């Protein structure tokens, strides 16, 4: 086994120059440094480790070092260089798996000052350097300090333009930290049997003897790095046209909103607490006031006649009277960009907030306001106006104006290369960023069809035929309920699973929760499974918190297997529990449940345990599913990539969107995805049959 790291002049999409590399070899216990002129020798050393059946360890290697070396070898040496996946270990992947609850464990380090605030909860190598006590400074910070001392101006990214010996020193230190991190990770007995020295085994032993989760996360990271490099073909022109349409509607709404809500006066500038006129008790709920020290009704007498009252004193033209408190105010014109203004006008129209920020302010967005209804038609029209404005503003932010807007992320190849963290959530679910492709509006939401249609295989033309590619969209059928049925099966002998596959599960749930409609039941069960609170559940039937609590209670009473499952989870996790001053005090047996692939899935609170179990099961099923689908497609002779037959473009929770060279290939992808899902169910002895649904078409609007 060898541990390595490279430094180059840019991120993957624009990298052109290898600066240096370092290798630590466990067989010799030596560090070897490679400078720019040693690039060929460095590649030779890596290939020699592969030839021995050994392992190469990088931090973030799957996403950067490995593809960067392939690119640079061709660019600088005209050499074909490809490291096989099975020979590569990524400590970033292992860190995210083994320390998925890093934010919980980092609090002590943060308080002690061992970990800087900017590194809190981070899996970056620099953060691990601080945690492990191996940090010798950060190259960028030291480079900027050196420039300051020399009186030179820093330009963003210039520390990577050219090789220097300080860079070489930091490169060595990065490998020191990666080695220390690797050894910490390998010491976790849950994932790596302690009787095996994993630094002294070949790749076959490493993958077969470590926990299954280790292999799954590495395969997923490798595949999703490939997906990110593929990118999602994007119709820039269509979204630019949509932006023009949205901006015009926004202008119209701004005018209407200003006309509707006009202006008002509000307190501003008071410095003293208002006190009760009789008792003198401060009244903090009232606006702050000011008490003038000068001023009156009349000015002071100027002459004898005025003093004797024979002649009136002049009127005091000053605005205030000494000792008479007043509330300073300002004139405010309604500003639709102000959340304070919006929530004020909404509450005046009869809206009652149900969700608040950490600072106590009402949360105001289009989702929160979705179900808001008041009796007064005029006030309802005002609320609807605000709702539409917020929705339009959100679409504009997503598509064009926001920091992470789609138009800002279209690469030169006409594709959006969204980033995926395959294990970003504590449950094992992936998270998405730059931009977040998991938040593209659905086709049923306003402007959703135009948004989804912009993401499509049709926007990629084949390099040989010039024809547009075809899109295959496949999603897991009813995954959440099937996961629930799997875990319930030991308590109901598979009755719930049978109802899902052969009956009408939503009608069954409707009866169990005593809900008025089947649609209510669908909304209820998914809210229930995703941990919705009593208030949210109550809103399903247009009621509040108490009704929501009652619905949950009835559902559990009438579905005893779910109650038994919840109780079983509680018994596994909780030693004892009591409520003190509205807070649950828990004595834990352990704070994790076992995932399908053996991993520890950390639980934040007892009431979230069932939701965590189900979300983790769904995430791991889909993760293994996308891995197996690609594997089966390659086994059938298809090549992954835009220069081949199919290309993964997006994986979002329980669906994959795949670009295909022809309709025939798209059909093969849809059929293979179903085969792969069935394989996953068999592999983990799932107690409810797993299925997929596939659609073929030109873009995401059709294939979702």
Swiss-Prot record:
<feature type="binding site">
    <location>
        <position position="476"/>
    </location>
    <ligand>
        <name>Mg(2+) 4</name>
    </ligand>
</feature>
<feature type="binding site">
    <location>
        <position position="5"/>
    </location>
    <ligand>
        <name>Mg(2+) 2</name>
    </ligand>
</feature>
<dbReference type="GO" id="GO:0006302">
    <property type="term" value="P:double-strand break repair"/>
</dbReference>
<comment type="function">
    <text>Replicates viral genomic DNA. This polymerase possesses two enzymatic activities: DNA synthesis (polymerase) and an exonucleolytic activity that degrades single-stranded DNA in the 3'-5' direction. Non-processive DNA polymerase that achieves processivity by binding to host thioredoxin (TrxA). This interaction increases the rate of dNTP incorporation to yield a processivity of approximately 800 nucleotides (nt) per binding event. Interacts with DNA helicase gp4 to coordinate nucleotide polymerization with unwinding of the DNA.</text>
</comment>
<feature type="region of interest" description="Polymerase">
    <location>
        <begin position="202"/>
        <end position="704"/>
    </location>
</feature>
<dbReference type="InterPro" id="IPR012337">
    <property type="entry name" value="RNaseH-like_sf"/>
</dbReference>
<feature type="binding site">
    <location>
        <position position="475"/>
    </location>
    <ligand>
        <name>Mg(2+) 4</name>
    </ligand>
</feature>
<feature type="binding site">
    <location>
        <position position="506"/>
    </location>
    <ligand>
        <name>substrate</name>
    </ligand>
</feature>
<dbReference type="InterPro" id="IPR034699">
    <property type="entry name" value="DPOL_T7"/>
</dbReference>
<dbReference type="GO" id="GO:0008408">
    <property type="term" value="F:3'-5' exonuclease activity"/>
</dbReference>
<dbReference type="GO" id="GO:0006261">
    <property type="term" value="P:DNA-templated DNA replication"/>
</dbReference>
<dbReference type="GO" id="GO:0004529">
    <property type="term" value="F:DNA exonuclease activity"/>
</dbReference>
<feature type="binding site">
    <location>
        <position position="654"/>
    </location>
    <ligand>
        <name>Mg(2+) 4</name>
    </ligand>
</feature>
<dbReference type="Pfam" id="PF00476">
    <property type="entry name" value="DNA_pol_A"/>
</dbReference>
<keyword id="KW-0378">Hydrolase</keyword>
<dbReference type="GO" id="GO:0000166">
    <property type="term" value="F:nucleotide binding"/>
</dbReference>
<dbReference type="GO" id="GO:0003677">
    <property type="term" value="F:DNA binding"/>
</dbReference>
<keyword id="KW-1194">Viral DNA replication</keyword>
<dbReference type="InterPro" id="IPR019760">
    <property type="entry name" value="DNA-dir_DNA_pol_A_CS"/>
</dbReference>
<dbReference type="GO" id="GO:0003887">
    <property type="term" value="F:DNA-directed DNA polymerase activity"/>
</dbReference>
<dbReference type="InterPro" id="IPR002298">
    <property type="entry name" value="DNA_polymerase_A"/>
</dbReference>
<dbReference type="GO" id="GO:0046872">
    <property type="term" value="F:metal ion binding"/>
</dbReference>
<comment type="similarity">
    <text>Belongs to the DNA polymerase type-A family.</text>
</comment>
<feature type="binding site">
    <location>
        <position position="475"/>
    </location>
    <ligand>
        <name>Mg(2+) 3</name>
    </ligand>
</feature>
<keyword id="KW-0239">DNA-directed DNA polymerase</keyword>
<comment type="subunit">
    <text>Composed of two subunits. One is encoded by the phage and the other is encoded by the host thioredoxin. Interacts with DNA primase/helicase; this interaction is essential for the coordination of DNA unwinding and nucleotide polymerization on duplex DNA. Interacts with the ssDNA-binding protein. Part of the replicase complex that includes the DNA polymerase, thioredoxin, the primase/helicase and the single-stranded DNA binding protein.</text>
</comment>
<keyword id="KW-0479">Metal-binding</keyword>
<feature type="binding site">
    <location>
        <position position="522"/>
    </location>
    <ligand>
        <name>substrate</name>
    </ligand>
</feature>
<dbReference type="InterPro" id="IPR043502">
    <property type="entry name" value="DNA/RNA_pol_sf"/>
</dbReference>
<keyword id="KW-0808">Transferase</keyword>
<feature type="binding site">
    <location>
        <position position="174"/>
    </location>
    <ligand>
        <name>Mg(2+) 2</name>
    </ligand>
</feature>
<feature type="region of interest" description="Binding to host TrxA">
    <location>
        <begin position="262"/>
        <end position="338"/>
    </location>
</feature>
<feature type="binding site">
    <location>
        <position position="526"/>
    </location>
    <ligand>
        <name>substrate</name>
    </ligand>
</feature>
<feature type="binding site">
    <location>
        <position position="7"/>
    </location>
    <ligand>
        <name>Mg(2+) 2</name>
    </ligand>
</feature>
<keyword id="KW-0945">Host-virus interaction</keyword>
<keyword id="KW-0540">Nuclease</keyword>
<keyword id="KW-0548">Nucleotidyltransferase</keyword>
<keyword id="KW-0269">Exonuclease</keyword>
<keyword id="KW-0238">DNA-binding</keyword>
<feature type="binding site">
    <location>
        <position position="5"/>
    </location>
    <ligand>
        <name>Mg(2+) 1</name>
    </ligand>
</feature>
<feature type="binding site">
    <location>
        <position position="654"/>
    </location>
    <ligand>
        <name>Mg(2+) 3</name>
    </ligand>
</feature>
<dbReference type="GO" id="GO:0039693">
    <property type="term" value="P:viral DNA genome replication"/>
</dbReference>
